[in-house]
Amino acid sequence: NLVARNQDDHVKNIAFLMDRTGQWSLSPAFDITWSFNPAGDWTSTHQMSVNGKRDQFTRADLLAAGRSAQLKRGRAEAIAEEVIAAVRDWPRYAAEAGVPEDRYGEIQASHRLDLLQLQHPEPQS
């Protein structure tokens, strides 16, 4: 949601499934679509927060969310890298789906592909 700008992310878009033995699991993803409008009531910022923020996310926010979810060391960053790689392919997906070029350009311009970059690079020795 952060990288591809689905800012209409709210708790009704997250679900769990229970199997016959009573075990819960996260449901397959649904209602995932680009929704960003800086002037919109519901789409100017994210509806759910990450690390207490609804915008201006950083690499540190993603890693903090991973720690909060008790992901193993490095897993949050690996997941973010996978997502960024998929979103980077947006032009190809858009072309395959027949999205008009001006529209896919608008969507692509809003993607956050730099979330894993260090905000303050460490000095070189």
Where are these regions (language model features)?
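Anionic ligand-binding catalytic core segments
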Residues: N1-S125
